[in-house]
Amino acid sequence: MPRNDDAAAKNGKQQPIAQALTDRAVAVPMTLWLISVLALAFCLGPPMNLVTGGVQGFFSNGPPRWRAAWALPTQMVLMPVLFVLGHRALGSQGPRAWGLQWARERRGPNAWCFVLLFPTWLLLDFFILGLEDMRPIMLLHHVTCIVAHMIACFPFAAGFGWYFLGVISLEFGSGVCNIFCFGWPWYPLTTYLYFAGMTISNLLACYCAYHWVQTVQSRSGRLIGIVITGVLTVMRQREAHRAFAVST
């Protein structure tokens, strides 16, 4: 019996190791791929800006029009698909259960892909635009998002599921903003789409933040989440109001 118990304990120890190795086997290629994306943006960004006329659209010193179009598949398709696949892999138990699983084991290719993808996607703009050409509000937005992402994915990992869903909500608003900035010809439809989509996006993000806060034990952690969500949603909504007022 002791030998069987020892064998079971040994197998129990080996299973997390095997899971970790599996995740590394997924995470390493993803990391290399994301680095290659940054390198590609660094090499192709300036020529693309030159060919397409550089920064265009409603916002001065915003992303180039080609960058806005390029972002849409990731914002509207890839991130939601990653969430759905990861959620189904856990038996569709809900965002809270996903967060608890992530806090315990830090495993799952869909989760790791999101963890790596989101900050890399934001870093692209630093390579494409450069610090000197970025709007201050855009720079503040990107830095805040990257810092918040690291905090939500690791120190406060129990809220990972709700955080992931909140990012999808925010990226939906950024997606309709990109459609507006892309300059599609059917104005004022895109203006109304931007204003309505951003409002819905911010409300959904606040809903997710409310549930995320319930997973955080420390008061300081809750305060960080409330402040970051509040600042981001207010900034985004103000920009949407300004664009709506100017364009209608």
Language-model region placement:
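Solvent-exposed interhelical
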Residues: 175
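Membrane-helix and juxtamembrane interface regions of eukaryotic multi-pass membrane proteins
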Residues: 3-6, 10-169, 180-248
